[in-house]
């Protein structure tokens, strides 16, 4: 199978780079880095072993790309309004799209745009950032959970195996469980680092915010349980706290968007899960308050 990477940044660049480094045929869509990567390749600095990729098959428009077997979407969900135009030229009858994005409801919305498309949710547990043109810094972790939304199982298993063969710690997790498990970490830490203008280690180093982070995690878990999602209980919140304690001090993607005055992923990270929970009578009150704070913060710099 050949792979196409849409969004060659901290996430797409890392996973696409690992696949290419393992010998898979991979093509990359680039924007501002196109000329640089075409001339100089991709550099992945990784805690698991750094590598450089020369002769990268890169494009500046999907209209110039051949149809893909598998498309990995690593764009921020704030750009999902572009997906119909981006994907239409490269989606064939047997194409699978893996949405490596944060939030709830992403696959449902993409399926409405492409009713027959095979879709997989990709939930990355990784600390990585783009630090320069064609230059990715992978600091720690790097696993990915795949949740099958609408993909034939044999194709799903082939993609899972390709990732594992490329040295990626990839696992199959039931779709709803995969999405909500990632939300347990994302909803507290992304928003709180913005609202308090801080980093993950400082949030957990203070007893008051450590307790609040845990309470927010349990709110996500309780919402998921109210929606019938299996595989989530308080032990998972404990695991996420323990994992974050062991991380290098980290600014999540939403904090970087805030720092650079870009739109934040509020709709899919907050508004959608809060709305879904309300439909079954569960009020995510602490996270709804955080959502309102984030909206105020974003409006203060986007509407100037």
Predicted regions and their residues:
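NAD(P)+-binding Rossmann beta1-loop-alpha1 motif at the extreme N-terminus of oxidoreductases
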Residues: 1-53
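Internal alpha-helical scaffold of NAD(P)-dependent oxidoreductase catalytic cores
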Residues: 89-90, 112-118, 133-188, 192-232
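Short internal beta-strands
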Residues: 28-30, 146, 274
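Hydrophobic anchor at the start of a short beta-strand
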Residues: 3, 25-27, 97, 119, ...
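Rossmann-like NAD(P)(H) cofactor-binding subdomain of soluble oxidoreductases
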Residues: 50-135
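Short alpha-helical
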Residues: 32-36, 78-79, 104-105, 154, ...
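NAD(P)-dependent Rossmann-like dehydrogenase/reductase catalytic/cofactor-binding core
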Residues: 164, 214-304
């Amino acid at each position: 199978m050949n792979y196409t990477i849409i969004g060659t940044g901290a996430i797409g660049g890392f996973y696409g780079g690992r696949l290419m480094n393992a010998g898979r045929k991979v093509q990359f869509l680039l924007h501002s880095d196109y000329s640089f990567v075409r001339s100089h390749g991709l550099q992945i600095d990784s805690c698991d072993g750094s590598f450089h990729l020369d002769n990268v098959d890169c494009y500046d428009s999907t209209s110039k790309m051949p149809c893909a077997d598998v498309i990995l979407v690593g764009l921020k969900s704030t750009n999902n309004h572009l997906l119909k135009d981006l994907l239409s030229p490269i989606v064939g009858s047997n194409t699978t799209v893996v949405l490596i994005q944060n939030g709830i409801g992403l696959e449902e919305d993409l399926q409405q745009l492409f009713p027959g498309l095979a879709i997989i949710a990709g939930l990355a547990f990784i600390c990585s950032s783009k630090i320069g043109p064609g230059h990715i810094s992978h600091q720690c972790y790097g696993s990915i959970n795949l949740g099958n939304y609408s993909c034939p199982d044999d194709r799903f298993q082939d993609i899972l195996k390709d990732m594992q063969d490329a040295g990626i710690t990839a696992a199959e997790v039931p779709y709803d469980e995969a999405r909500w498990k990632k939300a347990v970490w994302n909803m507290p830490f992304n928003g709180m680092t913005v609202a308090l203008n801080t980093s993950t280690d400082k949030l957990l180093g203070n007893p008051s915010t450590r307790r609040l982070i845990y309470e927010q995690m349990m709110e996500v878990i309780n919402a998921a349980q109210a929606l019938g999602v299996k595989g989530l209980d308080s032990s998972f919140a404990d695991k996420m706290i323990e994992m974050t304690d062991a991380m290098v001090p980290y600014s999540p993607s939403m904090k970087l968007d805030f720092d650079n005055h870009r739109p934040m992923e509020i709709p899919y990270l907050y508004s959608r899960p809060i709305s879904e929970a309300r439909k079954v009578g569960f009020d995510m009150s602490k996270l709804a308050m955080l959502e309102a704070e984030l909206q105020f913060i974003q409006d203060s710099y986007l509407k100037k």
